């Protein structure tokens, strides 16, 4: 057998490392070479402490391990992909920021060290901003100098991310609508061994364009302007840049993806970047503009709350189910009414929209009886309820239905190990949270594909994984997230980050 370790450094702590030495027999066939290195000790966390979207947080090179990460390497690079720069291309209000943040969230979840760099953020931190900064070719000397200064600052930060922070995927979010600018980026980064992939976002659908414009007008660029003034200013910026827009073509000899109307059509040219870029393309095929919120709720109670016996709801659990249904429907109706009363241009930025609840709300539940039965009152209202096998709770294996003291007595060494790394550790014949996250990836993609309001009724273990993805939690935080039955978790979407609100369910009247 060839020496796998010397054949490819990527297998050092990843796929295939277990074949280098005989495995030690045990309850869960422990590895002799650690897959996870430099792991932080887990600390307690609740939703109040992790209610800020972590998608823009720093990547800690010493301990960066993501919930969906399959393996780790010494270099930090995964999927044999090397370093990649993704360059967004498009006019204002064509979903470039939405794409950059969504790709960042997904690839970070996979374990790729990713960071998005937004021109708008650099502009907001600058002083003495000239009035023509928004044009790809400013008309004043001050504007030219200002844009060039910010551009160089962004490029230097991207280089530092690759060289100093072991970054693997950087996303450059700016207009990049001229061929000469794209060619310069390709030349600059190819010379240092960074592959460059362009994603051109094209929006011709008027409904998508209108919502993008409304979202853009909510940004700091238009702060203090009336609605009419903001629209006029936006149209001025668009008209100034349109003459310089050169759509990507084959004669540029660049690798690119044309992303048309938020995934209704995707064109890929010269994809020479391998598996990781293919994962990104597949993700983009599933990505849609969000018009709804995601709600998380625990299932109702049963008499013994056992794992082994698939119990039915008790009287308290049935009462909870009725109250949950009333509360969720009331919340959605309130949000829609608030939208109607608002003079904001953002049609559905907070998740409310105009469709009937029977068609605009979907309920996903786990496969166990009490989880599905918690949603029966929604079915009676004519709302679609789906049992999802992916929402099957974490399998506790040999420790099912044991108390903490019983686990300590029966599995003392395993219990101590589980405290060191509760995310990756498996008890005998059990799943780890990592196993759960990997098998739930198809559901994450379907959640990205759905524009409706979604209520997910599930066990706490699966809610932790879903919340961890949407709020970019680390694998240190995720196992300790606390979901209680008296709280409904509401996650709303915006292009730059997700927001969460904890709502009190009125279980006592």
From Swiss-Prot:
Q: Where do the segments described as 6-phosphofructo-2-kinase lie?
A: 6-291
What does the record say about induction?
Answer: Expression is under the control of the RFX1 transcription factor.
Point out the annotated site residues (description: Transition state stabilizer).
298, 459
Keywords from the named record: ATP-binding, Cytoplasm, Hydrolase, Kinase, Multifunctional enzyme, Nucleotide-binding, Phosphoprotein, Transferase
Which residues does the annotation say bind ATP? Answer: 90-98, 212-217, 415-418, 460-464
Give EC number(s), comma-separated: 2.7.1.105, 3.1.3.46
**Segment Fructose-2,6-bisphosphatase: which positions?**
292-466
* Record-annotated active site: 173
Which residues are noted in the entry as beta-D-fructose 2,6-bisphosphate-binding? 298, 433, 464
Q: Which InterPro entries match?
A: 6Pfruct_kin (IPR003094), 6Phosfructo_kin (IPR013079), His_Pase_superF_clade-1 (IPR013078), His_PPase_superfam (IPR029033), P-loop_NTPase (IPR027417)
- Protein family membership: In the C-terminal section; belongs to the phosphoglycerate mutase family.
Q: What else is known?
A: Present with 3380 molecules/cell in log phase SD medium.
Q: How does it assemble?
A: Homodimer.
Instruction: Report what the protein is called.
Output: Putative 6-phosphofructo-2-kinase/fructose-2,6-bisphosphatase YLR345W
Q: Say which species the protein is native to.
A: Saccharomyces cerevisiae (strain ATCC 204508 / S288c)
From which lineage does this chain's organism come? Eukaryota, Fungi, Dikarya, Ascomycota, Saccharomycotina
